[in-house]
């Protein structure tokens, strides 16, 4: 009898474990809201794709993964471009299927117009990307060594009540887009 009871409990737990969703917390919530993943990717149109690629690889330390081509008719039919074909170069923080992708592309035959990137309030739209780093001082130094600029007085410490011991540095990519680096200073 005791053996049967223990076996029944084990079978019940095994059944519960088998039906449990593999995702939990915010990721599970995102999937419950109709999304297929909790990941968000970004596309950035640049004026010089090679220069931008060097910045995202060398200054930010992203990993370039396989890119892809978008044919003219796909660009037109999807509303992404006015019948312009384009190549997309893809970068990630890590070569991991769940890592956010930063996708850069250039339109040599139809160059875009620059927006005012002086401050985040200077134009509407997506104003900056945020990367969370392990050491803000090392990340800022990597940007400087790669020829980039940390703007204003960064890195600056966030208010202690918001995030004690966490710093913020804002840098610009070659087209002036803001990239925010957030993390602690290692001693």
Q: What residue ranges belong to the model's regions?
A:
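Vicinal oxygen chelate
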Residues: 46-50, 65-66, 97-100, 106-178
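A broad helix-preferring feature
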Residues: 13-18, 178
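N-terminal beta-strand motif that seeds the catalytic metal site of vicinal oxygen chelate
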Residues: 17-53, 65-70, 74-80, 125-131, ...
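Residue-level detector of conserved, well-ordered beta-strand and adjacent loop positions
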Residues: 92, 105, 172, 182-183
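Bacterial N-terminal signal peptides
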Residues: 4-15
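Core segments of cupin and vicinal oxygen chelate
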Residues: 34, 45-99, 145, 162-164, ...
């Amino acid at each position: 009898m005791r053996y049967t009871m223990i076996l029944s409990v084990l079978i019940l737990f095994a059944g519960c474990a088998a039906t449990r969703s593999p995702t939990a917390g915010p990721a599970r919530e995102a999937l419950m809201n109709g999304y297929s993943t909790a990941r968000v990717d970004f596309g950035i149109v640049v004026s010089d794709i090679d220069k931008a690629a060097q910045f995202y690889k060398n200054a930010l330390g992203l990993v370039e993964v396989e890119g892809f081509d978008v044919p003219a008719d796909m660009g037109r039919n999807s509303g992404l471009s006015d019948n312009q074909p384009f190549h997309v170069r893809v970068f990630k923080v890590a070569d991991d299927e769940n890592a956010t992708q930063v996708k850069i592309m250039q339109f040599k035959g139809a160059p875009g117009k620059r927006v005012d990137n002086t401050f985040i309030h200077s134009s509407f739209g997506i104003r900056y990307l945020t990367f969370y780093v392990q050491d803000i001082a090392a990340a800022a130094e990597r940007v400087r060594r790669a020829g980039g600029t940390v703007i204003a007085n960064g890195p600056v410490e966030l208010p202690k009540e918001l995030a004690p011991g966490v710093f913020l540095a804002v840098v610009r990519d070659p087209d002036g887009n803001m990239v925010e680096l957030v993390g602690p200073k290692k001693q």
